[in-house]
Amino acid sequence: MIFARYAVTLALCASTSTAFVAPKNAGHGVQVVASSERVVSPLMTSTLSKPETETSEPSVMRPPINLKWDKIAEQLVNVFGYSQTEVDMYAGEVDNSKETLMNIYKALQLNRGFENACNQQYMQGKIRGFMHLDNGQESIPALLDYAIKNGDKKYSYYREHTHALASGVDGGAIMAELFMKETGTCKGAGGSMHIFDKPTYFQGGWALVSEQLPYAAGAAKSILLDRKLGISDNEKYEKHDVAPPSDDDRISVVFVGEGGAQNGRTAELLNSAAKDNLPLLLVVIDNGRAINTYTGDVATNGAVYQQGIHYGVPGLLVDGQDAADVAKGGKAVIDYVRSGKGPAILQVHTYRFNGHSPADPEHERGRKEEKAWARVEQDPIKIFEDKYTANGVFTEDELKEMKKQVLADVKAMVKFADESPMPPVELAKQLEYPDAPDTDYNLKPAPAFADAVNARTISPEQMATVTAHIEMLRNKAKAGDISIGDAINLAIHEEMLRDPTTTIHAEDLQAGSSYDIPKLTQQTYGQIRAADEIIDEGHFIGKALGEGMNGYRPIVELMNTNFGIFGMAELSSAGNTYATTGGQFDMPMTIVGAGGTAPNQSLGAEHSQPFHAYVMGIPGLKICTAASPAAAYGITKSMIRDNGPCFLFAPVKMMKEAKGTVDLDVCAPLNKAALLHKASDASVAGGKAVTVLTYLHGVKEAQLVTDEIMAEGFDIDLIELRSLKPLDMDTIRKSLERTHKVAILDESTLTGGVGATISARISEELFDLLDAPVRRLCMDDAPVPYASSMEVAVVKRGSDLVKGVFDLITKKY
């Protein structure tokens, strides 16, 4: 893709002393040469300017940019490559159409009226929690209403009421959601910050600043996947074997504030969008306030629309107080993305008339004064009214009548919400998982289109290669010679062939990563389904979330599960999505990787963290472990078929050494533990048996000392906790009914660890079965040292289990 337009990319910067050179033949690898001075566009001087001292602070910290249409048109010609004739066409479609101008005005009034009603209802206590209003920024949803289509994917942040309205989401349902009512968009499960609507592809409503950016990239990727695989959504929004139309021009639109755009996720988004030529539009809502802090106080780059230059992503700046100009310029940028030329940025300079939320005291420097000034001087509705009554397009009576109609609609929305019922209490638990914990994944049918899609996307040579690879692994599995990593790889290939909507993301994917988990996936399914990713787990977990919301089944392989720390926000939202959306959006996602802490691991603290314990508190996640090839294979297959997010932890030091047979073509349950060794009846009768609960490397440690325990006349029920969440209390109960004593060999810390949770549940639910306190053998709270001489004090092993069992039986504990 050629961006010759960057040859003149900022003729607009000519007035600055900073040199800016971009080669005429610049594509995604565009090179930028600049002096040591920072590049500042004169278009952005009001955004970036700061007062020299507190005493010299002007009455308006952020003056209007007064960016007229001729300058916007100049950007479209110089940066986006439009001809002047094309630019004039975009202007004419708005300026010469009274109907279009009427629709823009109605959208402005609808969004203002809706937000005012929300504020009133909030003050009356009918809307609860956090709420963030959009007053003053109405030109942006008006653009949505004008130029965005129903099939486009829309991702917003927590200030999204108006974006949902403009996307066609029913206003009564939005208001009902804010009222916590069952008729709300998400049945009252989401609230103000989490508006979702599947029929209009309005996909949030995300509460963590900038988290929505990689999700939107994943949604854009799903559009490319549809086109590549030749599948599309049916009337139930499920994939079927009908190719998107030849003129499919869907895009993904994502909104972020200029403060949120300083987040590193923006750079990752631009890189990903440019690399894959995603049909993605980044809309930057530039109100000059990062929450309420003046953005210039915390960020040196207010010209977010220029951030894409280094990636070959063009940007446009518009004045958000002129709704007609926003519609003209915004439509041109949207059409640029629709045409397949790649991603783009639209920055809208605007003012927010309200505080961050209704409860905000707004103590930040200059905020109250700016707000009062902007309401008088920079109201986009008043500016529109003055402009189009002065030039005779509308009479005051016409405007009043349109406003009256819109406010009547808003009143009806409030009435609908107020009269709607509250959701039933049992709905909360029903929304925990899309698939019940006891689901039999063997009964889930494969997509009917699998063979057809495989035939048109995998060449005969590729199919022959992967078939031979699968057969080789299956023979190893039958012979008991397959490793954990290879067993997972086998399951992944079988599932990717069974269901072509399955995708995979990983670092070093082409090379098979560290344990061959994604081996041969890109060589077989191509880069569109098997993506090598940048070194940021949060980014590609986020992209997987966006794919999962849009009909795909992403797999994420973590080279080491501890690297998932970079993706905690995305993991949290993956777990919450099904419930938060009121059950509208399934969230299939399989995360798999090697982790845990083995004795004598010698990897140091960062690679030895109990990440499985960290994610235990995330609602909606199913968390499993696998210490054998059989468990790894069966669990992986089930997770890929599950409609919710699942996380499989495998033991890092056993990935290649542990070998065994596999029950081929069988999905394992995701809610069951496994009894690996059963104590003899004689030991149970003599009170010399103990239930041992463990997982990951603890399984091997326990197996290594079982003979030693038995040699002393004792015995154990050895239970592998293959499901940490949900926890299999039935298997634990059945064992304790025999042994009445339990030891937990735990690969997590004393405080907040897995063993702490299990111990608490046993004490609460099975206390009457215990003859002794629960014996926890867990990691110390200290970081895991590199040196083995110190590590022994932190990480428990087989010898600790022997002592723990002996102490329980001899009543020394």
Predicted regions located by residue number:
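Thiamine diphosphate
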Residues: 142, 201-422, 503, 516, 520, ...
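Cofactor-binding active-site loop characterized by glycine-rich and histidine/acidic residues
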Residues: 116-120, 124-277, 296-305, 310-312, ...
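N-terminal chloroplast transit peptides
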Residues: 2-49
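Conserved acidic/glycine
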Residues: 40-140, 354-356, 361-525, 770-813
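Internal gly/pro-rich beta-alpha loop/helix module
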Residues: 595-644
